[in-house]
Amino acid sequence: MNASTETSIALPDINDIMRNLPHRYPMLLIDRVVAFSKRERLVGIKNVTINEPYFAGHFPQKPVMPGVLILESMAQACGMLAFKSEQEELGGNHIIYLVAIDKARFKRPVEPGDQLRLEASLKRVMRGLWMFQAQAWVGDALAAEAEIRCTVKEA
């Protein structure tokens, strides 16, 4: 699906992402949103460059994005899906907390120059717990996938 078939509202830009997520450099791991369907799915982009601070030590001779940061980027896409889906109800005084990651699998390394396509799909919301299926893709290759659970709380 392309962005125009998924939503009739303007897609979040980096300023909107920064209004909704509390993360800042070097932990803001989503650069833009390219598709959004309220309470269904969000597709975000993370451009991976050699200038990322973690590449200095992971690993100097063969830089690879740490798996935990791939998971964090997927969790941020899930957070954006939750916030954009409920922005009228939540207002601006809430923060999303990661509760659990299950069934995390890493399929290929993510290297400098790669563009991560972060796909977050909402499975259900139950008693304040948001449950997502998330994937990170590089081109047509699945890099990682996980089930992610979050909760939204007042800041």
Curated annotation (Swiss-Prot):
Record flagged with keyword Cytoplasm: yes
CDD domains per record: FabZ
Primary location recorded for the protein, binned into one broad class: cytoplasm
Entry keywords, A to Z: Cytoplasm, Lipid A biosynthesis, Lipid biosynthesis, Lipid metabolism, Lyase
Catalytic activity: a (3R)-hydroxyacyl-[ACP] = a (2E)-enoyl-[ACP] + H2O
Entry superkingdom: Bacteria
Localization, UniProt: Cytoplasm
Top-level class of the enzyme under EC nomenclature: lyase
Enzyme Commission number: 4.2.1.59
Keyword field contains Cytoplasm: yes
Family: Belongs to the thioester dehydratase family. FabZ subfamily.
Protein name, per record: 3-hydroxyacyl-[acyl-carrier-protein] dehydratase FabZ
Organism: Alkalilimnicola ehrlichii (strain ATCC BAA-1101 / DSM 17681 / MLHE-1)
Top-level taxonomy: Bacteria, Pseudomonadati, Pseudomonadota, Gammaproteobacteria, Chromatiales
Name of the gene: fabZ
